A protein has these predicted regions:
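ATP-dependent carboxylate-amine ligase
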Residues: 1-100
Length: 100
């Protein structure tokens, strides 16, 4: 899961630079917080903007609870890579992955 968190990564004009970066991943997930976009006073960012940059196979999350539910449903024996300069809106990884 890649979190878009920095000023540049949340900027719709910067997003095309991500083209192909998740290509090696079996599943491609991207998370961003609309609240972070608003807090940074950046132009609105939509799921389609993200999908256009990363490709149609990407699963886009803009809601922490939906991301958490999806992560809980990944099942055992899966490697999940979390990449961010942020904190996934405060997601508690110890609790989330405690059963694994």
């Amino acid at each position: 899961v890649l979190e878009l968190h920095t000023f540049s990564s949340l900027n719709p004009e910067f997003l095309p630079l991500y083209q192909g970066v998740l290509a090696p991943a079996d599943e491609k997930w991207v998370y961003y917080s609309p609240q972070a976009v608003a807090h940074k006073k950046l132009p609105a960012l939509g799921s389609e903007d993200v999908r256009s940059a990363f490709g149609s196979a990407v699963r886009v999350f803009d809601n922490k609870e939906e991301l958490e539910t999806a992560l809980r449903n990944t099942g055992e024996n899966n490697a999940v890579v979390m990449m961010s300069s942020g904190n996934f809106s405060g997601l508690n990884f110890d609790e989330l992955f405690a059963s694994y």
